[in-house]
């Protein structure tokens, strides 16, 4: 396993990010407000999922990075909530 840094760039709000390795994930979030970065351990030849929940004022831009590489960017809509999932 190697270590990589998961990080978020956001001006305001709260967030929870979870990297999912297997179908039966432990449910522990890897990056939680107020921390803006966390070290995670991954296997280079394994596919992972990312689930994110962000609560922030409407129009707040955010970017999520893995080892400095942009993997997701978005903007919080009028509900004040942005949530979703992606493959990393």
Regions found by a protein language model. Give the residues of each.
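Beta-strand-rich recognition domains
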Residues: 1-20, 40-88
């Amino acid at each position: 396993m190697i270590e990589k840094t998961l990080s978020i760039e956001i001006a305001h709000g709260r967030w929870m990010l979870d990297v999912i390795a297997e179908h039966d994930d432990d449910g522990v979030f890897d990056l939680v407000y107020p921390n803006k970065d966390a070290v995670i351990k991954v296997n280079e030849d394994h596919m992972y999922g990312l689930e994110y929940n962000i609560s922030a004022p409407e129009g707040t831009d955010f970017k999520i990075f893995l080892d400095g590489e942009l993997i997701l960017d978005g903007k919080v809509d009028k509900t004040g909530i942005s949530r979703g999932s992606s493959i990393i």
